A protein has these predicted regions:
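Small-residue-enriched transmembrane helix-hairpin modules in multi-pass membrane proteins
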Residues: 18-21, 45-60, 186-199, 203, ...
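Cytoplasmic juxtamembrane regions at transmembrane-helix boundaries
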Residues: 95-97, 107-111, 223-244, 342-352
Length: 460
């Protein structure tokens, strides 16, 4: 049975663009149908919810015509022909997060927001589509192993435990006077109190919440080691008591759900279908019931608007701002900023290089942080469509490296632990994801734990 499943994996991974209808198997047809269903749900939600309730953020009344609807469908289904069918490698997790939260919502919102949307954004979304398709094809170069059962070594887990406890101690000594479970009314006051007082404190916050705690919680959950799982869970709660980030509080519950899905459906080609169908059904329910049921009103803001709609909207908002006031040409990226000149339009702006704050002030007229995906910040804002292609090249190289060092690991464990990072990839710059949220450390850690010499029976 295992060899049969492995054969299906290899067969699916080596398939390229279809040369005949025989290539389009049942699973691929289901995925295409699910993507189209999700797209129509987003169109319906834009018309019945976003443009009515969330217009402040930039969701305009939709402009329906045959040409933009056809273009939406074409841009949606092209990547679906090459997207992975199985959630069996880290790159699949990141690709689906990007498509679900950024690409498809961006295409729908961008094409509906203006009467001249096609003239405005056709080149931009064509580059986005090309970059995504190229990424889906390129990650297939890493072979998939069927004997993926390795768990994190004891020295690695000990390192994560020590790292977690160190962050606990440093953060407790820094914030012991303001620790609290903030309610809805005082959540922003708590965030102000819990703001990082230095670069080191900031790294302690994000690494505890997005690296050490996910590793420990996933390990404890999958291997049924209760104390390890509790330590990871405590890390999420502790950071929430400092920063009042709802995302951090919800991560362990989302990871628990993801672990169940990866274990039950990871080798099932219908798993991505459930993602798009489930997301589409949720959007339909929100659009129909947000003004009748309080639960759907909350889901409308936190699930639909914040998680799905805004990351997609930011692709076009960043393009509208930076294409007119000047692209950054990656001068906002740490390291490049040391020798690159700040564009004239932002040289006197005290918010530079925080592009999200610049956009919030200049487009929305508010003091906020419009966090966007790496496509918007490191691609669109940097150089428009060509910038998107450039950042996709780097992103694809990183995904290939991550898949390569992930060979042989327990896939359920690894995908569960990586889920928070996949979420961050839809809401943050690529450089921030690598340095501040552990994207680079993951590759180093897996390589170190996998290829170093053995001591005392464990890999070091």
């Amino acid at each position: 049975m295992d060899s049969e499943i492995a054969g299906r994996f290899r067969e699916q991974d080596t398939s390229i663009l279809p040369s005949s209808l025989a290539w389009v198997n049942v699973a691929r047809i289901k995925l295409l149908a699910a993507v189209v269903f999700y797209v129509f749900a987003l169109v319906y939600g834009h018309d019945k919810y976003l443009s009515l309730v969330q217009a402040f953020w930039g969701f305009n009344s939709p402009h329906f015509n045959l040409s933009n609807m056809l273009l939406i469908i074409v841009l949606a289904v092209i990547p679906a022909f090459v997207m992975p069918l199985y959630l069996t490698r880290p790159s699949s997790l990141f690709i689906y997060a990007l498509v679900f939260c950024v690409y498809l919502p961006g295409v729908v919102t961008g094409m509906l927001n203006y009467e001249d949307s096609i003239d405005r954004y056709l080149g931009l979304f064509s580059c986005f589509c090309i970059g995504l398709v190229g990424c889906c094809l390129a990650v297939r170069c890493v072979p998939l192993r069927s004997n993926a059962s390795r768990s994190f070594s004891r020295p690695l887990l000990l390192t994560c435990v020590l790292g977690s406890l160190t962050c606990f101690l440093v953060l407790f000594l820094t914030y012991k006077d303001i620790l609290s479970f903030s309610g809805v009314d005082d959540i922003y006051a708590q965030r102000e109190k819990g703001a990082a007082t230095s670069l080191f404190i900031g790294y302690c916050q994000v690494y505890l919440a997005y690296f050490f705690s996910p590793v420990l919680f996933a390990t404890g959950l999958i291997s049924k080691r209760i104390l390890i799982a509790l330590l990871g869970f405590a890390g999420f709660i502790f950071v929430f008591m400092i920063t009042a980030e709802r995302t951090v509080l919800l991560l362990p519950f989302a990871m628990f759900l993801m672990a169940f899905i990866f274990k039950a459906r990871g080798a099932n080609p219908n798993a991505p279908v459930y993602l798009f169908v489930g997301g589409g059904v949720m959007v339909f329910l929100i659009a129909e019931l947000f003004d009748q049921v309080g639960l759907f009103q909350e889901l409308g803001f936190y699930f639909y608007t914040r998680l799905i709609a805004c990351p997609g909207l930011f692709v076009t908002q960043y393009y509208d701002l930076f294409s007119t006031q000047g692209f950054t040409y990656w001068a906002h990226v740490s390291g490049i900023s040391w020798f690159a000149e700040v564009p004239a339009a932002y040289a006197a702006d005290e918010k530079w290089p925080a592009l999200g704050k610049i956009l919030a002030e200049r487009v929305l007229g508010v003091q906020s942080q419009s966090n966007a995906s790496f496509v918007a910040t490191d691609g669109v804002a940097a150089a428009g469509g060509p910038g998107v292609l450039a950042i996709f090249m780097l992103y694809t190289v990183w995904l290939i490296a991550l898949d390569w060092v992930s060979q042989g690991w327990n896939k359920v464990l690894l995908l569960t632990a990586l889920f928070p990072l996949a979420f961050i990839s839809t809401n943050g710059p690529f450089s921030t994801m690598l340095a501040s949220f552990g994207g680079g450390l993951w590759i180093a850690m897996l390589w170190f734990d996998k290829f170093r010499m053995k001591l005392w029976g464990h890999r070091l």
